[in-house]
């Protein structure tokens, strides 16, 4: 399969023009990517320019390309990721040659580990709790949350009659309601009211297809409610879903207004964080995600028992939730005959949805917009070349490309009018249809029997003025009748010579204009990159529009923020547009503050023209009612997902025909308008009909987990194949792999207890695991912020001017420095913390303005945090009093570890900088080199001389400029060693190991060629290999001081000792056991040995975090508790006093540094009160080192859980004075001075990287703990003799000095 080549017939029809070549090559590459082949080779008839174009397109699409051969034999081949399967082996080979980075526990951790393993030594029972537990299905059913919002109202028939009478009375008496009712009656959907209610009564599923503005969204729910109340006198629960929360809220408010009610009475809504109404509301609007959680959370039996109607609006948007929801509802319909499903769409894709539901009836409702003239790139170039000609003359404006869907009645009327005109010379009816309802569909309509068109009739009858009118309207003279005659031939046959001459001249001019336009197009395409927006062309076109007209807003559709900003800057640099009194330039983008966005709805004063620069948000989400001119770049930035390379993509791509139609319609809302498409007619014809459904361009981990929660016995792939457009198999495989890595699914794809808990939290499964970890290490508060920020938009605003943008970047750096710097994620944590404290002081507006923070985003994060906190309390994961759950929220090591858990496995290694290149390059697990985005705080990270530091990041995004990561954070090595999927050990690089590697590779090659021989000797040779691996592994781990290579997830190599590998392995096992215990017993305290282990892990992470801050910023230690002044040289951003006062306000109240929290105050919820004594604290700190001090404002000495590494002392090998643990093995002290080899029959991992076995790790960790605590005793059976405690020399000296 790997070398299989893909051939197609596409080369045979290779076009010659530049534009056609791009379209053809795109089709070939997309077909290849969708195929199962690895290589595709183009034919030899490609020019150098064509090969260059294909190379460029391949880079953008994540496909490798290579040209080979010379002359006529030169070929271009394209490949799918060739290094995909080999990258980890390549990384291993590379690590053998390079100097390994050393990783070890931080100074001070030895004392913590000694105490832990002394009282809770490793044993086989530690790892028993880490095995996956299959979800039984009982706990979830018992703990289901009942939401009355979606239950049917409890009202009697008499009460229904009262509601109907009250509504009728309001509509008759209230003047405002009378006016509203009058407007409602003029909506196109009004005449379809009876047809809709009748179809709903007769069919379980119907589809309403109506153009934007026909009234379906606001009127259909009212039609159904009135029908149930007035005609049937029955209660109902009508649930209407919208893809966006703002739509759900605004539509429900509009309907309440139309009925003269307050929102929340009979009409309500429920969106994330907000709701109005309740069970008493008969109509409820919600987002698709809300209804999906209802369907999944309650189970198929009870989820729709009280719902009578489900209206799914805007199904043409194809968001993943709606597609997934429709698949669930389709399965529920047969067992719920009372349920009615109403689908509503604004596009022509109705047939697919109708077929998906067994051919359900379709009600088509026409819309109303003014005619819109459509021009393409050829026309725009000709207009700009023509110079002084006014392209907006009244004649040209009347030309319309407005697409009209002809009904059967329209066709019948046209047939009759054509026959009357041709046979009886009665032209009034035909002229009336042509002039009053002008569109290309009418101008070029062909009689169903004779195929005659209106132009043929007028030409054959010699009506010269009517022929000229139709030709000016764009009627097609080349259409043929059933006899095979065109309008020109028909005029000549009827001896209408003047009409024939007019048509002939028009045809010649059209051909000449067409040739001229094509020449202009070819010349233009040869000089620009069509994949990018031509800002200069947009500026010239806008100047032409403004010169030929005096009023009318201009709406420009652009792909993204960069293009919006470039266009705005270009316009402001032009003196013609720089006058703010004449032009009001407004940007419409999610990064623009809400106050600025609202200006788009205001009409400008007389003499001022409004120019709106927008993304596709202006296609349907908002309506700007004074737009007359639309400039469509034809491009849009859409987030997608490449499952083959496992990267997200955010690229500028061509829109679909449906998108282009929506953009065109924006020009005809208030009066006839013009749409300028800045792409050719050929490109327009090649566009897809509809955009790719979201479920095909996103990772599907959450959906796969929801499938298993919905039906634990169902195969994920089997259910997802029921969707209208299932995700590709590779996406599903990637999702299942991640869910298995984090323990949500077993290797057999069974739902685990951990996965069941993850699935019921309203965050991504990876974020759920982070929350559990944060609770265990008492770092909940920042974890809540990180979890909610990952599910919401960027909280920082992007100013327009370059100077302000530099200030915004500096502000973000300053915020990040509060948490240690080198992070985009921690900048959000700091921003929220400062905003929350500023809000309490009444300074939130000042803070948001000074640090370019979006107030609305902060408010939303605050609400999302509250909701997530409530969910965690409801599931018992955190207590009602969470004051003790965030005591380590300011500790840099623990905070970054929490972040690493939430972002794993998105880990990269920083590449060293070369020469003068200051850009940060990161190597990922796949071997790819990606850049850090220019908007990231870590854009210039390489200049800080980091030595192969690790970064964790949200996602890899492939954009127009290549692959990059946007939000990332520098991470320490130790947290990733604790949370990674796999760690494996091998001897450090030597000639022997290299030779053995080569031999193994040769063996693998021989095995590949002689499968039958190997199969015959599998048993005997397998036993020999197993023994050899065991012998080598035992030798490698036989001594604690042995240097070994530690490989994380088969690609990140480190150098460490055998002892530290063993200790790390035990900590990993106990960490996973703690998480699983917390999942299965959320309201119980951790067992003593797990609670002690989490204490140890938190302490080690704290030490590790401080060890990584060799020159910490001033903000890391507040002034009121600073024990010494640090040299902050080298830190680029220092928080000012205003920011420091906001961030450290909590610490000011407590008068202590967060990392100095007393150890026995930690984990009050996760551990029993007596557990705090199970690990002896680092007592008598000054006794161990009389030079150490701990100064505070109060002057009191405090015991520390975590010692500040910058004030670190040499730790003695102190013996613990705590009581022996019941977990301690009987022979741990008696044989502690023996070196205990690993079992010789232990099986290891692959040939090069031996996975650390618990049988090896446990004895080594246990022996080392017992070595450091020796007891000189006589016969253990002699209980009458007192044991003498061995005290190291340094500790004896300390005690003597104290005396």
Curated annotation (Swiss-Prot):
Tissue: Specifically expressed in the tapetum and vascular tissues.
Biased composition (Polar residues): 1176-1193, 1204-1214, 1239-1251
Residue ranges, annotated region (Disordered): 987-1039, 1175-1299
Key words of the record: ATP-binding, Helicase, Hydrolase, Nucleotide-binding, Nucleus, RNA-binding
Keyword Hydrolase among record annotations: yes
Regions that span the bilayer: none
R3H domain span: 15-82
Protein EC: 3.6.4.13, 3.6.4.12
Lineage: superkingdom: Eukaryota
Biased composition (Basic and acidic residues): 1023-1032, 1279-1299
InterPro entries: Ankyrin_rpt-contain_sf, DEAD-box_helicase_OB_fold, DEAD/DEAH_box_helicase_dom, HA2_WH, Helicase-assoc_dom, Helicase_ATP-bd, Helicase_C-like, P-loop_NTPase
Record-linked Pfam families: DEAD, HA2_C, HA2_N, Helicase_C, OB_NTP_bind, R3H
Sequence motif Bipartite nuclear localization signal, location on chain: 1182-1200, 1267-1283
Gene Ontology cellular-component annotations: nucleus
Catalytic activity: ATP + H2O = ADP + phosphate + H(+)
Protein's UniProt keywords contain rRNA-binding: no
Subcellular location: Nucleus
Residue span(s) of domain Helicase C-terminal: 537-711
Ranges of biased composition (kind: Low complexity): 1007-1020
Biased composition (Acidic residues): 992-1006
MF terms (GO), sorted A to Z: ATP binding; ATP hydrolysis activity; helicase activity; RNA binding; RNA helicase activity
Cited PANTHER family: 3'-5' RNA HELICASE YTHDC2, ATP-DEPENDENT RNA HELICASE
Physiological role: May function as an ATP-dependent RNA/DNA helicase.
UniProt protein name: DExH-box ATP-dependent RNA helicase DExH6
Gene name linked to the record: HVT1
């Amino acid at each position: 399969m790997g070398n299989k080549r893909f051939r197609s017939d596409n080369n045979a029809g290779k076009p010659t023009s530049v534009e056609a070549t791009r379209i053809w090559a795109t089709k070939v590459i997309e077909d290849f990517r969708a195929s199962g082949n690895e290589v595709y080779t183009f034919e030899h008839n490609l020019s150098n320019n064509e090969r260059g174009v294909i190379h460029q397109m391949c880079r953008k699409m994540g496909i490798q390309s290579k040209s080979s051969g010379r002359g006529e034999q030169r070929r271009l081949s394209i490949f799918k990721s060739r290094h995909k399967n080999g990258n980890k082996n390549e990384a291993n080979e590379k690590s053998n040659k390079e100097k390994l980075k050393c990783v070890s526990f931080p100074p001070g951790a030895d004392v913590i580990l000694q105490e832990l393993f002394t009282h809770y030594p490793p044993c086989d029972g530690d790892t028993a709790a880490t095995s996956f537990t299959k979800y039984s299905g009982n706990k979830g059913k018992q703990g289901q949350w009942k939401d009355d919002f979606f239950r049917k109202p409890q009202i009697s028939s008499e009460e229904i009659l009262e509601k109907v009478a009250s509504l009728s009375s309001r509509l008759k008496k209230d003047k405002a309601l009378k006016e509203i009712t009058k407007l409602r009656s003029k909506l196109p959907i009004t005449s379809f009211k009876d047809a809709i209610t009748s179809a709903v009564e007769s069919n379980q599923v119907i589809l309403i297809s109506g153009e934007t503005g026909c009234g379906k969204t606001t009127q259909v729910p009212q039609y159904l409610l009135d029908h149930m109340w007035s005609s049937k006198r029955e209660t109902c629960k009508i649930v209407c879903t919208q893809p966006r929360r703002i739509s759900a809220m605004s539509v429900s408010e509009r309907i309440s207004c139309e009925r003269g009610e307050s929102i929340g009475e009979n009409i309500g809504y429920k969106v994330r964080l907000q709701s109005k109404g309740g069970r008493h509301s008969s109509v409820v609007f919600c987002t698709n995600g809300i209804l999906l959680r209802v369907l999944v959370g309650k189970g198929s039996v009870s989820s729709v028992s009280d719902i009578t109607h489900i209206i799914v609006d805007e199904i043409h948007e194809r968001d993943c939730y709606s597609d997934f929801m429709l698949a669930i509802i389709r399965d529920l319909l047969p067992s719920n005959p009372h349920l009615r499903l109403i689908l509503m769409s604004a596009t022509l894709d109705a047939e697919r949805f109708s077929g998906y539901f067994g051919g359900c009836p379709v009600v088509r409702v026409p819309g109303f917009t003014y005619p819109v003239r459509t021009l393409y790139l050829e026309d725009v170039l000709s207009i700009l070349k023509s110079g002084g000609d006014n392209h907006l003359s009244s004649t040209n404006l009347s030309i319309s490309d407005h697409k009209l869907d002809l009904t059967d009645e329209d066709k019948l009327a046209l047939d009759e009018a054509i026959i009357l005109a041709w046979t009886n010379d009665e032209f009034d009816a035909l002229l009336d249809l042509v002039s009053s309802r002008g569109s290309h569909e009418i101008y070029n309509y062909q009689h169903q029997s004779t195929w005659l068109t209106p132009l043929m009739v007028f030409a054959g009858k010699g009506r010269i003025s009517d022929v000229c009118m139709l030709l000016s309207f764009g009627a097609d003279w080349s259409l043929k009748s059933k006899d095979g005659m065109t309008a020109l031939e028909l005029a000549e046959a009827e001896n209408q010579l003047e009409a024939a001459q007019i048509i002939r001249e028009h045809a010649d001019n059209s051909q000449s204009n067409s040739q001229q336009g094509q020449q202009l197009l070819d010349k233009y395409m040869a000089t620009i990159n069509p994949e990018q927006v031509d800002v200069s062309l947009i500026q010239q076109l806008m100047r032409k529009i403004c010169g030929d007209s005096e009023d009318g807003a201009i709406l420009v559709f652009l792909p993204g923020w960069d293009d919006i900003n470039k266009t705005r800057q270009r316009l402001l640099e032009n003196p013609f547009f720089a006058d703010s009194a004449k032009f009001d330039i407004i940007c419409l983008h999610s990064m623009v503050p809400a106050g600025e966005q609202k200006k788009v709805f205001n009409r400008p004063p007389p003499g001022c023209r409004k120019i709106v620069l927008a993304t596709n948000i202006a296609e349907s989400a908002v309506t700007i009612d004074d737009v007359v001119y639309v400039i469509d770049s034809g491009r849009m930035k859409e987030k997608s997902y490449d499952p083959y390379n496992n990267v997200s993509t955010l690229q500028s791509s061509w829109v679909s025909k449906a998108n282009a139609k929506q953009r065109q319609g924006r020009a005809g809302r208030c009066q006839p308008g013009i749409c300028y498409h800045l792409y050719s007619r050929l490109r327009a014809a090649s566009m897809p009909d509809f955009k790719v459904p979201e479920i095909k361009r996103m990772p599907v981990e959450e959906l796969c987990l929801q499938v298993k929660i919905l039906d634990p016995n169902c195969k994920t792939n089997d259910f997802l194949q029921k969707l209208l457009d299932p995700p590709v198999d590779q996406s599903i495989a990637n999702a299942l792999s991640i869910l298995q890595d984090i323990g949500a699914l077993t290797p057999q794809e069974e739902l685990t207890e951990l996965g069941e808990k993850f699935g019921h939290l309203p965050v991504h499964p990876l974020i759920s695991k982070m929350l559990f970890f944060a609770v265990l290490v008492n770092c909940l508060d920042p974890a809540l912020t990180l979890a909610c920020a990952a599910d919401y938009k960027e909280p920082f605003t992007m100013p327009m001017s370059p100077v302000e943008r530099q200030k915004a970047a500096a502000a973000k750096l300053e915020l990040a420095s509060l948490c240690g710097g080198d992070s985009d994620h921690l900048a959000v944590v700091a921003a929220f913390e400062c905003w929350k404290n500023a809000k309490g002081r009444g300074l939130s507006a000042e803070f948001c303005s000074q640090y370019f923070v979006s107030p609305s985003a902060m408010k939303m994060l605050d609400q999302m945090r509250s909701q997530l906190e409530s969910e965690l309390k409801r599931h018992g994961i955190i207590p009602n009093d969470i004051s003790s759950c965030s005591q380590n929220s300011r500790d840099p090591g623990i905070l970054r570890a929490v972040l690493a858990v939430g972002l794993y496995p998105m880990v990269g290694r920083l590449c060293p900088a070369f020469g003068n290149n200051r850009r940060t390059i990161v190597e990922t697990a796949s071997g790819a080199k990606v850049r850090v985005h220019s908007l990231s705080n870590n854009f210039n990270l390489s200049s800080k001389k980091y030595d192969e530091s690790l970064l964790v990041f949200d996602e890899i995004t492939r954009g127009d400029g290549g692959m990059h990561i946007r939000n990332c954070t520098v991470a320490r090595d130790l947290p990733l060693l604790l949370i990674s999927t796999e760690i494996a050990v091998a001897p450090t690089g030597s000639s022997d190991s290299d030779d053995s590697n080569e031999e193994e590779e040769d063996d693998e090659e021989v095995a590949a060629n002689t499968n039958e021989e190997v199969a015959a000797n599998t048993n005997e040779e397998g036993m020999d290999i197993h023994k050899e691996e065991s012998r080598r592994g035992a030798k490698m781990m036989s001594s604690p001081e042995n240097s070994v290579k530690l490989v994380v997830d088969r690609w990140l190599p480190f150098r460490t000792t055998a002892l530290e590998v063993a200790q790390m392995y035990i900590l990993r096992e106990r960490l996973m056991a703690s998480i699983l215990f917390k999942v299965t017993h959320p309201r119980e305290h951790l067992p003593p040995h797990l609670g002690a282990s989490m204490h140890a892990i938190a302490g080690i992470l704290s030490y590790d975090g401080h060890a990584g801050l060799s020159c910490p910023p001033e903000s890391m230690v507040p002034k009121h508790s600073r024990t010494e002044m640090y040299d902050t040289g080298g830190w680029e951003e220092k928080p000012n006093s205003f920011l420091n006062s906001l961030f450290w306000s909590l610490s000011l109240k407590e008068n202590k540094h967060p990392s100095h929290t007393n150890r026995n105050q930690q984990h009050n919820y996760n551990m029993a009160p007596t557990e705090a004594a199970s690990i002896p604290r680092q007592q008598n700190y000054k006794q161990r080192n009389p030079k150490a001090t701990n100064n505070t404002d109060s002057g009191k000495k405090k015991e520390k859980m975590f010692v500040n590494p910058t004030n670190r002392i040499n730790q003695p090998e102190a013996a613990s004075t705590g009581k022996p643990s019941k977990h301690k093995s009987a022979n741990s002290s008696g044989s502690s001075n023996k070196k205990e080899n690993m079992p010789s029959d232990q099986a290891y991992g692959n040939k090069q990287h031996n996975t650390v076995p618990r049988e090896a790790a446990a004895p080594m960790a246990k022996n080392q703990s017992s070595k450091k605590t020796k007891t000189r005793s006589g016969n253990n059976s002699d209980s009458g003799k007192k044991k003498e405690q061995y005290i190291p020399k340094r500790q004896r000296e300390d005690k003597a000095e104290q005396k």
